[in-house]
Structures are given as C-alpha cells and as structure tokens.
C-alpha cells in the first residue's frame, strides 16, 4: 500500500507526504499449534518532505519494522521504531551540504542506536562525508567513518577510514556481507 500527497504553498515552498506499508506471513498455518499464520515481516513507513525554499529541504521519516528472527518457525518478533531527520542545503548550483540524524528504538537484539551524518558535495563529481553511529543499548560502541568519493558517469570510487560493524551493506538493491573491521576501505562501483 502506497499513499502520496502534496501541499503547495508556492512554487518553491511545499510539503510532500508519503506512506507505505507491507507485510509477509507464513504461507499456511502448519507451523503453529493453532493453525494461524505467523508474521515474517512488517514494514510501515511515513515521511514528510518540506521544501522551505528553493535551496533548503528537510525530510522527516518514521519507520516501524517487525521481523521474525526464526523466519516464522517460533513465535515472537523483533520490533524497531526508526526516526530520521535529513536536511539538505544547496549553497549554489555546484555545492551542497547535508546533515542527517537517526534514532532506532528497540527492546530487542542490541537495543537502541543513534547515528549522524555530515556531507559536503562538490558537483558534479566529488563529495566528502563523516558518520558516527553509537549503540545506546548492549554494546555502547562507537562506529565512525570519514571518507571521500568521486563519481563520473556510471563509475564511483570511494575511499574511507573508520570502524565498521559486521553486517550487510546494500546499495541500489545489491547487498553484500561485510565483516567488522577498523581500517581503510576502497570501493569501486561501476554499472554496465
């Protein structure tokens, strides 16, 4: 289910509202004692994008995610509430600064997280960025990254240094597993 709505005050000042929901359950009730289906995944999202003026926009996002760590074989799901504020300011046609703050609230797994990003883009090819992610729950660990990227056509080169946690990194619908590490990362992305 997807919903979209725009409220326009003027040509350069307007709000865009979006909402999306999706879910998946087990195919039949054979995995449960009472014959009911079990939740595998639930994803409910709402965001509001405000264009304050031609150069400045802010996006507010809320996402509620529930998923079954046992893929429906056992009862119980993990639940996360995610809040994001992203602000972008176009200094001129070639320079943009962007900041983002995220908060993930959960009583499950590693519990609460907070993250931030600062990025400066020199159009059309260069950007520099710094990120910080901190676990407020179980581990109390900081994960930081600073880097630079260059793009031309369908090719992108990124050089960064930081402390990264293990997990899947997804970009453009392509995901890869990355082990935990602290160090330098060189990434080349090309589309054919």
Task: Show where each model-derived region lies.
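Exposed, low-structure sequence patches enriched in small/polar residues
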Residues: 1-192
């Amino acid at each position: 289910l997807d919903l979209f709505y725009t409220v326009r005050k003027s040509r350069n000042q307007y709000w865009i509202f979006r909402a999306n929901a999706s879910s998946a359950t087990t195919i039949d009730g054979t995995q449960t004692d009472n014959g009911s289906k079990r939740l595998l995944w639930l994803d409910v999202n709402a965001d509001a994008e405000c264009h304050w003026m031609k150069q400045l926009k802010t996006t507010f996002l809320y996402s509620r995610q529930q998923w079954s760590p046992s893929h429906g074989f056992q009862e119980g799901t993990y639940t996360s509430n995610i809040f994001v504020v992203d602000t972008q300011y176009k200094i001129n046609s070639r320079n943009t600064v962007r900041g983002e703050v995220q908060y993930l609230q959960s009583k499950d797994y590693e519990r609460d997280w907070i993250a931030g990003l600062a990025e400066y883009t020199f159009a059309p090819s260069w950007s520099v960025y710094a990120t910080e992610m901190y676990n407020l729950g179980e581990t109390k660990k900081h994960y930081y990254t600073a880097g630079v990227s260059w793009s031309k056509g369908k090719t992108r080169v990124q050089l960064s240094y930081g402390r990264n946690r293990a997990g899947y990194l997804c970009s453009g619908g392509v995901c890869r597993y990355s082990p935990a590490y602290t160090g330098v990362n060189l990434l080349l992305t090309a589309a054919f």
